Amino acid sequence: MAVRELKNFVNGQQVAASSGETSDVINPANAETYAKAAVSNASDVDSAYKAAQKAFEEWSQTTPSERQLALFRIADALEARAEEAADIESENTGKPRSTLVEYEIMPSIDQIRFFAGAAKNLEGRATA
């Protein structure tokens, strides 16, 4: 199996850590290295923070209906790739793949859809 390279996801782009440093990611079920992940430093965190701050400013201007639609699209995309998500999660956690779709992936999709419905109704209000 080829060892994958996992980069940081910043501002919609996959980017290596500025230091170029990586760390092995090991499947706990078989102790095999399946990926190398970027090891981020303060500069990388600052870049990610700035990108997230900008994205939040844009996201906060979306309507509840737009937010709902975005969450439904995320749920649909995850559902379409549920088997792939289960493979990745099994590799990452060592959990049996056979249980992941039914007991973790599909309930996660249900939660996203639940909160998509709530997004349209909350309209920025909060209760204590």
Predicted regions and their residues:
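Terminal low-complexity tails and localization/encapsulation signals of metabolic enzymes
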Residues: M1-K36, L69, R73, L122-A128
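Glycine-rich loop-to-alpha-helix module at the N-terminal edge of alpha/beta enzyme cores
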Residues: E32-L122
